[in-house]
């Protein structure tokens, strides 16, 4: 799919992978709707991009707020990139007792249910569009994590949510094939995003040293570059791509 002149929704656009993706797509000529609950971050991204971007304050778990964003995308809407998500560190049984059910449910609600909410509403709008080359109507890119496969201590909730995102990729791609809509997922490894920003520098260096090559944290721009490749290559469909420098997390 040609990106130039199309409109894309990017969730979690206020920082990290979402911000880099919004910048990448706008640079390729797209209009970007920057969705986030972080008003300052979302407005900052849209402002940095300029005329090709608009900030939309939207909670991915809200049907009405996402539906309004989809409506704002108009007839040029060509897809979405799901980057919104949260992470927690909580053991199944810790010093204070069992994992809090509320915190587990919150991670699932935002990371998995929120992603699906965006997928279904965007896909419903795209299905009404006139098809382009090869009958394509749009593309949706999701964000999982290598934690979906190599989850660490304290990552039960996060791994479950990202494992769900990885698992829904193929069935949704099959569901939407008749409409000419592709569904892909990227599973990033260790990236230099706000989720890791709070760690002490020695801890960040230790994490980077675990990556076989390149032995560093990923740059969000590298994630965004893969998003662009996925959008532009119609044969990429129904797959989860690990973007991790060959990292396989050891139990810790």
Model region roles, listed by residue range:
Residues 219-243, 248:
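C-terminal substrate-recognition "lid" of short-chain dehydrogenase/reductases
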Residues 28-44:
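Conserved glycine-rich Rossmann-like NAD(P)H-binding loop of the short-chain dehydrogenase/reductase
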Residues 86, 97-117, 141, 158, ...:
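Catalytic Tyr-X3-Lys loop
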Residues 145:
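Residue(s) in the substrate-gating loop at a strand-loop-helix junction
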Residues 124, 173-175:
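Alpha-helical segment proximal to the catalytic Tyr-Lys
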Residues 2-33:
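Canonical Rossmann dinucleotide-binding motif of NAD(H)/NADP(H)-dependent dehydrogenases/reductases
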Residues 87-105, 124, 128-134, 154-157, ...:
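Conserved mid-core segment of classical short-chain dehydrogenase/reductases
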Residues 177, 182, 236-239:
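Short, small/polar-rich loop/turn modules that mediate ligand/substrate recognition or access, typified
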């Amino acid at each position: 799919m040609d990106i130039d002149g199309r409109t894309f929704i990017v969730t979690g656009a206020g920082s990290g992978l979402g911000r880099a993706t919004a910048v990448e797509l706008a640079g390729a000529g797209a209009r970007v709707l920057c969705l986030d609950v972080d008003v300052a971050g979302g407005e900052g991204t849209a402002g940095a991009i300029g005329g090709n971007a608009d900030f939309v304050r939207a909670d991915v778990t809200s049907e009405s707020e996402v539906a309004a964003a989809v409506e704002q995308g108009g007839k040029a809407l060509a897809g979405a990139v799901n980057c919104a998500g949260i992470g927690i560190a909580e053991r199944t049984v810790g010093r204070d007792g069992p994992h809090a059910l509320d915190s587990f449910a919150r991670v699932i609600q935002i990371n998995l249910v929120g992603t699906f909410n965006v997928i279904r509403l965007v896909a419903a709008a795209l299905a009404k569009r006139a098809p382009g080359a090869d009958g394509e109507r749009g593309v949706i890119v999701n964000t999982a994590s290598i934690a979906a496969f190599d989850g660490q201590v304290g990552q039960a909730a996060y791994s479950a949510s990202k494992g769900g995102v990885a698992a829904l990729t193929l069935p949704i791609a099959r569901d939407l094939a008749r409409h000419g809509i592709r569904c892909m997922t990227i599973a990033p490894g260790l990236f230099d995003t706000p989720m890791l920003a709070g760690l002490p520098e020695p801890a960040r260096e230790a994490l980077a040293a675990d990556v076989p090559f390149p032995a560093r944290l990923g740059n969000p721009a590298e994630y965004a570059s893969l998003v662009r490749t996925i959008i532009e290559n119609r044969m990429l469909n129904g797959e989860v791509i690990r973007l991790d420098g060959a990292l396989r997390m050891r139990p810790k």
